[in-house]
Amino acid sequence: THLFQPSLVLDMAKVLLDN
């Protein structure tokens, strides 16, 4: 099972915002 990790989402959102 693939658990959803908030840290991963925050990191991706951070990259999107930085871009």
UniProtKB/Swiss-Prot annotation:
Location of the protein in the cell: Secreted, Extracellular space, Extracellular matrix, Interphotoreceptor matrix
Q: Which GO terms describe its cellular component?
A: extracellular region; interphotoreceptor matrix
Per the record's keyword annotation, is Transport included, yes or no?
A: yes
> Which keywords annotate this record?
Extracellular matrix, Secreted, Transport, Vitamin A
Q: Which domain of life is it from?
A: Eukaryota
Kindly list the GO molecular function terms attached to this UniProt entry.
Answer: retinal binding
Q: Does the keyword tRNA processing apply?
A: no
Question: What does the UniProt function comment say about this protein?
Answer: IRBP shuttles 11-cis and all trans retinoids between the retinol isomerase in the pigment epithelium and the visual pigments in the photoreceptor cells of the retina.
| Name of this protein | Retinol-binding protein 3
Protein encoded by which gene: RBP3
